[in-house]
Amino acid sequence: MQMAGRGANRRGQHRSPVLVRPPDAEWSMRTFGVEEELLIVDPVTGEPLALADALLAGQDEPTSGLSHELKLEQIETQTRPCHSYGELLQQIRRGRAMANQAARQHGARVAAIATSPLASNTHTTPDPRYAAMLDRFGIIATEQLTCGFHVHTSVESPEEGVVVLDHIRDKLAVLTALTANSPYWRGLPTGFDSYRTQAWNRWPTSGPSSVFGSLTAYRRIVKRLLETGVIMDEGMIYFDARISRNHPTVEVRVADVCLRAEDAALMAVLVRALVETASLEMLDGVEPTAVPTALLRMASWQASNSGLRGDLLDFGDFLPQPAADVVWALVDYLSPVLDDQGELELVKAGISDVLDRGNGAHEQRETAVRYNKRQHDGQTQPGSPPTNEALAAVVGHAAKVTVRGAAADAHKDPAPMLTRVRRP
């Protein structure tokens, strides 16, 4: 099956690839699933609440679809493997509804925001590994109350997984900009759209990785990193994208948790298209672009800083271009696969909505501005920092949007199991 590209973007720096599947290949859409980290918050003050133990009491974590994370102020949801945007969206909403139902039983709510707008002390989940991380990494672990969004996409083998990692590494910063949802940090405006990215990149292995070239090389690098003694175990391989240790998947880890469930499902569709495009490029003999890792770090920093507000570094030449142009260039690059999978129009509509509305960081800032104007009869000093009350309003708004569209009965479907994420 041949999928014709749509041609070059306006500067001709990157084209939608012309990809050819082997004519005898059996093909079906890759399954995908996601993990979302959510804040547990006070619905009045907006402050994080250390209630994860209470929310998870009596639940079988491996099968419930809810689990602990590093901090007691957060809870993680996991979807089942899915085949379509609609199926995944239903699962994401279900996970959010389950978490929120558990939180409501203790007078709390969950909010899909990637950092806490309000300052508070954090509490590490009682667990020997987490205790060792706290002792080893100090303030990095102490302050690590951040909520990310991880997308797992099925691959045929670890070898294919490494090919995917090498091909997608230069495009991941665009996802950071689209999902950026953390403009505040411990009571302060940061000037960043995704400050979670900055906080997360303090870990020793975090951020973009180099081109590996083979599974042997990937495993050699992981082995060398472990031999340094700096990190505790393979679970601390925090590359922007990695081969999952537990599932037959590639795991992409650059995104903030998305405020809206629809945006989360949309980002997962983009990731799946990246994975499929990478695999087809391999079959066509297309080599990964050897962009220096230093440039990828710069692109990640820029996406984290300005989000969709200004320029991003274009993934063709890594020069600054308007963010919307770079986002549409990514859609254009992925369009053959998206079209083949019947998702192109869905993605175009979803991306248009995000660009028109703004990412989560923009929505958080706008909520704070609206609150201040209401409290001061429309008279506010430009650039004045938001009050704690305004930040509480940000959290309250986020908590409402987080569960918008969630099913009334969050326990109807079978329990999520990401271990089943694979091609049928």
Curated annotation (Swiss-Prot):
<protein>
    <recommendedName>
        <fullName>Putative glutamate--cysteine ligase 2-3</fullName>
        <ecNumber>6.3.2.2</ecNumber>
    </recommendedName>
</protein>
<dbReference type="GO" id="GO:0004357">
    <property type="term" value="F:glutamate-cysteine ligase activity"/>
</dbReference>
<dbReference type="InterPro" id="IPR050141">
    <property type="entry name" value="GCL_type2/YbdK_subfam"/>
</dbReference>
<dbReference type="InterPro" id="IPR011793">
    <property type="entry name" value="YbdK"/>
</dbReference>
<dbReference type="GO" id="GO:0042398">
    <property type="term" value="P:modified amino acid biosynthetic process"/>
</dbReference>
<feature type="region of interest" description="Disordered">
    <location>
        <begin position="405"/>
        <end position="424"/>
    </location>
</feature>
<dbReference type="InterPro" id="IPR006336">
    <property type="entry name" value="GCS2"/>
</dbReference>
<keyword id="KW-0547">Nucleotide-binding</keyword>
<comment type="similarity">
    <text>Belongs to the glutamate--cysteine ligase type 2 family. YbdK subfamily.</text>
</comment>
<dbReference type="GO" id="GO:0005524">
    <property type="term" value="F:ATP binding"/>
</dbReference>
<dbReference type="Pfam" id="PF04107">
    <property type="entry name" value="GCS2"/>
</dbReference>
<comment type="function">
    <text>ATP-dependent carboxylate-amine ligase which exhibits weak glutamate--cysteine ligase activity.</text>
</comment>
<feature type="region of interest" description="Disordered">
    <location>
        <begin position="1"/>
        <end position="20"/>
    </location>
</feature>
<dbReference type="InterPro" id="IPR014746">
    <property type="entry name" value="Gln_synth/guanido_kin_cat_dom"/>
</dbReference>
<keyword id="KW-0067">ATP-binding</keyword>
<keyword id="KW-0436">Ligase</keyword>
